[in-house]
Curated annotation (Swiss-Prot):
The keyword Ligase does not apply. This is Histone H2B.1. Keywords: Acetylation, Chromosome, DNA-binding, Isopeptide bond, Nucleosome core, Nucleus, Ubl conjugation. There is a cross-link at K149 (Glycyl lysine isopeptide (Lys-Gly) (interchain with G-Cter in ubiquitin)). It comes from Chlamydomonas reinhardtii. The gene is H2B.
Amino acid sequence: MAPKKDEKPPTQEAGAEAPAKAERKPKAEKAAKKAKKEPSKKAAKEPKGSGEKKDKKKKKSAVETYKLYIYKVLKQVHPDTGISSKAMSIMNSFINDIFEKVATEASKLSRYNKKPTVTSREIQTAVRLVLPGELAKHAVSEGTKAVTKFTSG
């Protein structure tokens, strides 16, 4: 078993991606001997691959934050004002919480009406229920404007 392990890393290092692609094709086509050898190669590759997948997951979670948009709005409202990372994190959590409340309320409304789909009408009603007074009016008008812009062009 030790010679097999010694043979595999040099082929991976020297060949890089080209041998890996060549090895995957025979596996798809089948071959009992190659199939037995490949799991050990897979085991050697999986930590690297799983590490890359974890990096991709981290990147996806970064995409899900609203930090960039919070910063853009801050600069529109107060161009010479900054924001700390802790304050940015709090604002991001606040937006996530509000969106979750609106989504939950919209889901309840669609269930009450026995409709399988959450439409813009349910979202609008949920916003009116979740947000207080004047804030709800502004949110509804901005949301209506955004939906109109999205559907028209």
